[in-house]
Amino acid sequence: MLQTLQQQGLRHVVLCPGSRSGPLALAAAGLMRAGLITLSTAIDERSAGFYALGRSSASGVATAVITTSGTAVANLLPAAVEADRSSQPLLLISADRPLRLKNKGANQTVNQEAFLTPVCRWCGSGPLDGLSAGLDQELQALAQNAWRHLHQQPGPVHLNLPFEEPLHPDLDQQSTFWSQWNSSESVAITHNPELCKPTSHSEAPSLDPDQPGVIVAGPWRGLSATLEPYQAALIAWQQRSGWPVLADPLAAIPSNLGGVIRSWDLLLPNGLSQLPANAQVLRLGSMPASRRLEAWIANQQGPQLLITEGDPRPLDPLEIAEQWSGGLAQWWKQLNPRLRVIDATKPDIEARGGSPLQAWRTADLELQQRLYELLPGHGPANEPALMFALARLLPAELPVMLAASSPVRDWQAFAASDTGRRRCYSFRGASGIDGTLSLALGIAAELGPTVLITGDLALLHDSNGWLLASAAQQPLLVLLIDNAGGGIFEQLPIETTPRDGFNQLFAMPQQVDPLALAAAHSIPVRQLACLDDLPSALEWGLGSAGPTLLRVCTDRSSDAQLRRNLRKALQQSKSLS
């Protein structure tokens, strides 16, 4: 079964400990020794699931997790939920007890086959009385079905395999099997690569590029194989229409895309000149993490089209856009040829049809200049200034992962000058903070040197990720913004009496030394004294061959007020009004 998965594209397996899963462990080890897959181990199934999800997201190809029976399977649910909502392939393989032991009080025997069903694209099972010899064709078919469902509409797939005892062959049996096994033997693969392309059975709706409009690019949720065609289609439509682009940091837009308004988050709601009443909105993927943008989109009166990369589920919380799931590249191809040709005899495309592009560009550049004045790169660290500095100091094209709380929002607002220079990741399908470190380690395993920007609670929540970091030695710089609790709650209209109740009920600061915790896992650590030291600290962290932790202490209350003051100052700026 594993060999069939490998021949379809499986490259990496994450193995968790267990006895019932022993046959799967031995099979995976055999493929690893033959050089067919790579293998890593993790004692925490929740961490393993997120690590595999990070690898899948970075590579665009499903990574597999193998677990034993019982609560081990339940611990895969958080990663499966995120894989489902963010449309990423994730293969979850669990060993189980045979049917004869179910619902009889047998040890470590639960109805695990149903645990992941609500969020999986497909759930497959081996024979309920246990796997046995002579089932090669059935297992190959099971593997092929799993791989097809993983990538046809990307998401999690669960294979539950009951095993009857005896579970563990002796050394002579193992030696005999591997000596006769043919690692190059191929099976008939019925998987069709075309199934991995976004599809829609409806005719593609059109917009009018000769009329005013705006492009809103949300988080990219397609496979790596479809990213380049997506980017090419995005460039083509923007060149044809001249529309401005408001892009989420996770949108994976190309660096040569025209019309990008980088500081839209700080310019909204009053810093962008009003669109004509009939302006169209082309929305790509899910909504960016901005309530200001969501409110602004809701106020637009013209036609709206939402295009997803193969996800047919409703993705418009505003319920005002027509949705099409065939993918942007296919949409561009299906447009009337007349709509895909720029007429050189017409006036400059930025001036046609009341396009606001030039005015928005001017406001964007002026706001960026104001940020240089308002956020100097020296003195004590604060979160807006830190993000603004990181956008300039981090090497271009170095991947960045942003924890799904304050970091992704602050990057969107204050690191906007970085838009299009690098791939940014943040797992906002379900927007949980669990698995943050493990996800980043998975990304680094696939892409090489990576930076994780996280808060203290998100890092502590996945502290078992340090076990993976210590063992795998991935080149990951963890930049910890330690503001003693949940800083995101300081930015919400939450009031408590007395004030101390806010910490107890919402911020929940923890009395843990993150430097000591990382050092206990043999992770090199460093504390940032001030913003002046940031360049040398980044050089230290990025110069390491393995994981490192750089801690930056900030004040969440004063930083929340600073954000409000910055937005007010920028909105009141004469040059931007």
Curated annotation (Swiss-Prot):
Keyword Manganese in the entry? The reply is yes
Q: Name one GO biological process term.
A: phylloquinone biosynthetic process
EC class of this enzyme? Answer: transferase
The catalytic activity, as recorded, is: isochorismate + 2-oxoglutarate + H(+) = 5-enolpyruvoyl-6-hydroxy-2-succinyl-cyclohex-3-ene-1-carboxylate + CO2
Q: What's noted on cofactor binding?
A: Binds 1 thiamine pyrophosphate per subunit.
Looking up SUPFAM superfamilies in the UniProt record yields: Thiamin diphosphate-binding fold (THDP-binding) (SSF52518)
Entry's transmembrane regions: none
Could you tell me what this protein does? Catalyzes the thiamine diphosphate-dependent decarboxylation of 2-oxoglutarate and the subsequent addition of the resulting succinic semialdehyde-thiamine pyrophosphate anion to isochorismate to yield 2-succinyl-5-enolpyruvyl-6-hydroxy-3-cyclohexene-1-carboxylate (SEPHCHC).
Subunit comment for this entry? Homodimer.
Tell me the protein's name: 2-succinyl-5-enolpyruvyl-6-hydroxy-3-cyclohexene-1-carboxylate synthase
- Organism, scientific name: Synechococcus sp. (strain CC9311)
Gene name for this UniProt entry = menD
